[in-house]
């Protein structure tokens, strides 16, 4: 058998140098590692990796070229009680693979064994890693680096955003190419968003359970290869990387940042009954959190949890993030179930991964947004992430809904959430931008469904409506479903307007769910992770143009208010904010805690937000001076000048001092 040269322990993965390929694989507990390469007919040839430096195995294959398909067979103990599940009968993906050929099918040969090893060879059905050679001309690309105070995030799904867009060439709808097409760039600019946050684009798999039901994982939170782009949204697997980078480059030229939703908390290997295709077979004990009985700690709800306190896994995570920043020029990340990142196993602000990110000159300067919880004990960590992390603020989401979709909520609680939840985020030197305010996200009701449904309707997901949260704080305004008489539809419209204004005129970083500005509905499905169909795709031809115009005007208004764009905490008497009652007097202690939902918020001494969240029309006396209503609450050419606002029920209006 041809021997490999020893090669080098870095860089990680498979690296082509023009003459051959250097291969590396981290495994602290392996006893032997075989590199397996495949020709065009699927014939396999195996080579032992001859070198080992620390826990990294390595070797160099002279003459190997880009396009080579490969995998690993890793030898070591089968000791499930100790967390070791080595099985060389199973071909394994390189965790650093930049491209993957094949899908992760629901196939018995991909199972590595539960109590006993499954020694059936899986090479015929296993996905293969592919060597790539990377050259790309970024031209004069530069990161927009939008300040947090001016950032407006737009959360979208690559396919769902553009798949039904009639103005895009049909062949690129639902693809990476579409994201950077002039039609989409113009739309983003017209809307006024500054950052496009994409649901996972790293290659993912559909869970076996979904495959058996004829469904697919649509959202992408089931990662298979963290360094490889999901190929389904490209012209071909070979062109995916360049097509994605073309989109990033086009968005950057328009001043729009690109943020990736990334899943560094579990893998698609799932629980012990899931497929063995990579990490489990490479070094189960190092990559995952293992219980005393050898099973997984399931702090993610997905069957396994990555051990991001292990030095080798910390390095893997940081290399992954650096790859997306340096190779694809992305501007930041939103971390799914991010409390896992801080587990040691208890959550710590000085956890190894946090420390590594903070110390990295590449990663510490991009936008980092945590989903600050997981489902394990002590997993809810809102407000506890260290700088430079921002966090999703579920306090804001719930308070905004409870305020406008009648629930019990004090004026004081609403004001606190409006002021970037300083009680939660004003710590560790963080600024108001650390509070990422949202009304909705991919997970949950859309904004329109918040005003049309009291109950979730997830029957299409195949779990008899058991999945998805029951805590929606929604209000159907008297009739379940989308239709209804004119007065009901008007009340729903008013509620949507009030909610959007609250989101886009509050201190903190607003995040808008793609489609909410259209009136998109998922017909009450609040967990559409497996619905790759018209339920989730945005229907641009049915979009509510008036609502889109309203949303864009709110974003423009936001950018005019220094109190919102300055990204500094409001202090008493600093001119940023005054809290007034319906008579333009400072709110009393009783009004803060027990008063009706009537208030005025004066921002930067020039912009006044008048709020009537009661069920009755109420006169609100504006502060002394001349006030004119501003778009989208009045026309540019015909501003309404008034001293008293007759506030409609569930109404909100913004005025500017003349």
Curated annotation (Swiss-Prot):
One of its GO terms (molecular function) is glycogen debranching enzyme activity. Gene3D superfamilies: Glycosidases, Golgi alpha-mannosidase II, Immunoglobulins. The keyword Mitochondrion does not apply. Pathway: Glycan degradation; glycogen degradation. Keywords: Carbohydrate metabolism, Glycogen metabolism, Glycosidase, Hydrolase. The active site is at residues 336, 371. This is Glycogen debranching enzyme. It comes from Salmonella typhimurium (strain LT2 / SGSC1412 / ATCC 700720). The gene is glgX.
